């Protein structure tokens, strides 16, 4: 399991990093690229899991105690470009650029997916 943001989302972290996304922090590409390279061709796809909390983001305790409010989950399987498992992120600048572009597109789609999920939840309440 890899969390590309590297940390939990908070409004303060979102402001500090000037994230271009509405619901996400900026992804950190290096760890994901390193993992794919280390695992070689063992992975052909990844599961992209988006979680939205229409009633507000719960604390860890609220999650653990079953008081998280509504939780929406969207899961999709995405193919991993085969060459992403064979290039060295730290030394190959062209690959690093391609990988950043791919992850940025994925994050833009993910941010829109969360926006759609929250809008859908709001429409159900209205």
Tell me what each language-model feature is.
Residues 86-126:
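Accessory terminal regions of nucleic-acid processing enzymes
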Residues 1-88:
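A cross-family acyltransferase "interaction/gating" segment
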């Amino acid at each position: 399991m890899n969390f590309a943001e590297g940390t939990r989302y908070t409004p303060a972290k979102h402001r500090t990093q000037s994230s271009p996304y509405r619901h996400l922090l900026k992804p950190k590409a290096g760890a994901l690229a390193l993992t794919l390279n280390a695992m070689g061709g063992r992975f052909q796809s990844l599961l992209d899991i988006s979680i939205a909390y229409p009633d507000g983001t719960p604390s860890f305790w609220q999650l653990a105690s079953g008081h998280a409010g509504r939780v929406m989950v969207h899961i999709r399987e995405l193919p991993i470009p085969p060459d992403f498992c064979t290039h060295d992120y730290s030394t190959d600048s062209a690959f690093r650029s391609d990988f950043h572009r791919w992850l940025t597109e994925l994050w833009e789609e993910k941010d829109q997916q969360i926006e759609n999920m929250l809008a859908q939840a709001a429409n159900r309440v209205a």
